[in-house]
């Protein structure tokens, strides 16, 4: 598989720092029961990965137009998943309908789009977790910023999100509400 160069920076942020590498390294140090250590909460795990892509701006990354384009196309790709997966599994879209929508609304290659659509056919709902998780983390961050005002600290917020390992989003929301 070949990826365009404009995806390199955002992919690195998602998979490495501050994305999954950071998230999983911290989780592996926690004293959690095995079912929590080795089971996954996709909306949390991939939601953090997608949320972290946006942190690239805060970290001074995406300095050139191509890197910014890469981040924006990745975010759009995850939003398209919401439409395409729902279209196929609720509105009875055909595989070709899904491919056409994806091609019309993304920067992905035809081969990438076909692979993605086949993934959604074989694993209904899974790909939705990325965007749903990201949106929940962003919602919780906005709430914490609003409630805490000048006392809001982004590092403390991220610590609060990650310090218990992967959680169902409603449980994460409870913990964030407790600090607000």
Q: Predicted regions: what is each one?
A:
Residues 1-180:
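N-terminal maturation segment of proteins
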């Amino acid at each position: 598989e070949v990826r365009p160069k404009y995806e390199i920076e955002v992919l690195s942020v998602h998979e490495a720092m501050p994305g999954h590498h950071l998230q999983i390294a911290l989780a592996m140090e926690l004293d959690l029961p095995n079912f929590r250590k080795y089971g996954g909460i996709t909306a949390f795990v991939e939601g953090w990965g997608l949320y972290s892509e946006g942190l690239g701006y805060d970290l001074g990354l995406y300095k050139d137009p191509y890197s910014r384009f890469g981040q924006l196309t990745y975010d759009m790709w995850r939003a398209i998943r919401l439409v395409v997966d729902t279209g196929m599994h609720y509105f009875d879209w055909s595989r070709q309908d899904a491919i056409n929508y994806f091609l019309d609304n993304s920067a992905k290659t035809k081969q990438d789009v076909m692979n993605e659509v086949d993934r959604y056919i074989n694993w209904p709902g899974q790909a939705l977790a990325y965007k749903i998780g990201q949106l929940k983390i962003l919602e919780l961050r906005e709430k914490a910023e609003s409630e805490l005002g000048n006392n809001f600290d982004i590092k403390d917020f991220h610590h609060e999100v990650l310090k218990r390992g992967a959680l169902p989003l409603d449980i994460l929301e409870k913990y964030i509400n407790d600090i607000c």
